[in-house]
């Protein structure tokens, strides 16, 4: 089976070097489950100074990423199976777990376009199938959002995480936050582990965890709780917990 291919168009390819060395994501790359390929627009610049930015038409602060080197870098990327092109921009839709699951399941290749400088030429948007943001804030470039997406997608690929069950139970997998976790010791500085978790009653443990997920989501993220209730129906809460 061919590895899941991740192509990144970036002016800072060195920023991605640690991804191949750390934790389960690095092991996934070494095991051939995923492949990371970096493309620097500077390698496609047409002048001897490898210039990739210019002043904005109409004036204004900062420099704008030119379209020619970005398009040239993009055109050099082969299409490998079911490809999706994502543009990293604070104007994009906020990244959700459902996006990561969709990209990991429905596609074999992601192309991640990282902006830089004050912004990018508007024509670069035409390359993208989707525009993605980490939230309502601005970073110096699209590299950190791209790394976030790479991490989130690769960990969902079969074999990356040892237990598939852990992917099902974690926060946002079905719209709810994850339940609390405890390990030894049973008592620490006056704080104890809930008795139900030490009871050995798997049914009671499952019910407790689901109750904790719902309570925690309602308290910390009422927006998620509202969406979850609309999806499953408040009348079906007890059935969903069973």
From Swiss-Prot:
Keyword Transferase: yes
Enzyme class: transferase
Pfam family, one: tRNA_m1G_MT
Assigned keywords, A-Z: Cytoplasm, Methyltransferase, S-adenosyl-L-methionine, Transferase, tRNA processing
Residues binding S-adenosyl-L-methionine: 115, 134-139
Entry EC no(s): 2.1.1.228
Single GO molecular function: tRNA (guanine(37)-N1)-methyltransferase activity
One GO BP annotation of this record: tRNA N1-guanine methylation
InterPro entries assigned: Alpha/beta_knot_MTases, tRNA_m1G_MeTrfase_C_sf, tRNA_m1G_MeTrfase_TrmD, tRNA_m1G_MTases_N, tRNA_MeTrfase_TRMD/TRM10
Localization (cell): Cytoplasm
Region (Disordered): 210-242
Task of the protein: Specifically methylates guanosine-37 in various tRNAs.
Record family assignment: Belongs to the RNA methyltransferase TrmD family.
Protein name: tRNA (guanine-N(1)-)-methyltransferase
Organism encoding this protein: Synechococcus sp. (strain WH7803)
């Amino acid at each position: 089976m061919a590895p899941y291919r991740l192509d990144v168009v970036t002016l800072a390819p060195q920023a991605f070097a640690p991804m191949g060395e750390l934790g389960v994501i690095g092991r996934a790359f070494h095991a051939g489950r995923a492949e990371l390929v970096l493309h620097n627009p500077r390698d496609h610049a047409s002048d001897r100074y490898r210039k990739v930015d210019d002043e904005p038409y109409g004036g204004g602060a900062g420099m704008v990423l030119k379209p020619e080197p970005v398009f040239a870098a993009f055109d050099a990327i082969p299409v490998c199976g079911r490809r999706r092109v994502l543009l990293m921009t604070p104007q994009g839709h906020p990244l959700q777990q459902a996006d990561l699951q969709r990209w990991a399941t429905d596609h074999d290749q992601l192309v991640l376009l990282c902006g830089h400088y004050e912004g990018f030429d508007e024509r670069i948007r035409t390359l993208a199938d989707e525009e993605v943001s980490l939230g309502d804030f601005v970073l110096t470039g699209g590299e950190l959002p791209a790394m976030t997406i790479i991490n989130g997608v690769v960990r969902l690929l079969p074999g990356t995480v040892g237990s598939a069950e852990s992917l099902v139970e974690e926060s946002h997998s079905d719209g709810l936050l994850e339940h609390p976790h405890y390990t030894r010791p049973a008592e620490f500085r006056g704080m104890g582990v809930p008795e139900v978790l030490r009871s050995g009653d798997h049914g009671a443990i499952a019910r407790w965890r689901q109750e904790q997920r719902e309570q925690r989501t309602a308290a910390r993220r009422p927006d998620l709780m509202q969406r979850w209730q609309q999806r499953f129906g408040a009348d079906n809460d007890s059935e969903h917990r069973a």
